[in-house]
Amino acid sequence: MTHDIVVIGAGPAGLTAGIFAVRRSMDVVVLGDPTSMSTMEEATLVDDWPGMPGVAGPELFAKMTAHAKKLGVLVKQEKALEIRSKGKLFVVKTDKAEYEAKTVIIATGAKHRKAMVPGEEKFAGRGVSYCANCDGPIFKGRKVAVIGGGDTAATYALLMEQIGAETSLIHRRDELRAVDTYRKELKKSKVKLILNSVLKEIKGDKMVKSIVVQDVNTKKLTDIPMDGVFVAIGTVPASELGKNVGIKTDESGFIIVDRSQMTSVPGVFAAGDCSNNKTKRIVTSAAEGSIAAEMAYEHIREAEL
């Protein structure tokens, strides 16, 4: 069986692509990786989704998934392993099956950027986390550090304070990059800001016991007792799948797309956080997914596939 579209990724970009595909009466399957969560699922609070201010990320994800399935989008929990060309068509291999498609939409999102400091790998899952929404509750009444200065770091710090953790937010610059809304909330909170400081090491025995922080100006090192560390310093694109068919990426690894979300390979599109579009938001990922589906429809018609 040949599908019109195979969408790789079941986050906001992938699900929206699926929705717009079925509205065009196309045969589409959306493949969600069961081993990872989308950034939407991990989001503590989504303040910029129109009509639903303050919605929790998992709630928005559940509603979007339900919407897609209600319209008839086939969503499968399978990990995509490879894309390969087959004449004018494509084959997507997963850990369970192979899918032949006229077009492919890559919506694999991005992965958490690591701090790359001693102890990070050793204590992953033993005090080091990249998702406060997932692991936050176990740190109630304990000391935690959130590393980063953007929106994600700010929301993690606010969430950890709400949970009841003694929270420090550590950022390398003299002011946060987070939007004003979150900065104002942090000022009203009990979150301790440690600015002009970088994480140098995570220490412990079986679990995290402390972190070493360096002042960027004085170079002084300080050992601070901690039970948990949440790393929130951005993401790197999950764009490896496209390399097998020759898809071009930029210097940071993001998939290069044009205004139609088409990659350098005709018939393969990319949408969401894995693309090289500058704005990384849930709402823009959804928009890119809709464009990719519409343009895939046009590509199939024009190529007479």
Region annotations inferred by a language model:
Residues 62, 68-94, 98-101, 162-259, ...:
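A Rossmann-like FAD-binding core segment of flavoenzymes
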Residues 11-12, 110-112, 150-152, 276:
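Residue-level detector of alpha-helix initiation sites
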Residues 111, 116, 122-138, 233-281, ...:
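FAD-site-proximal beta/loop scaffold in flavoenzymes
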Residues 2-4, 77-78, 140-142, 196, ...:
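Phosphate-coordination loops involved in phosphoryl transfer and adenosine-cofactor binding
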Residues 75-138:
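Glycine/small-residue-rich loop that forms an oxyanion/phosphate-binding "nest" at active or ligand-binding sites
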Residues 3-71, 152-179, 192:
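Beta1-alpha1 glycine-rich phosphate/pyrophosphate-binding loop at the start
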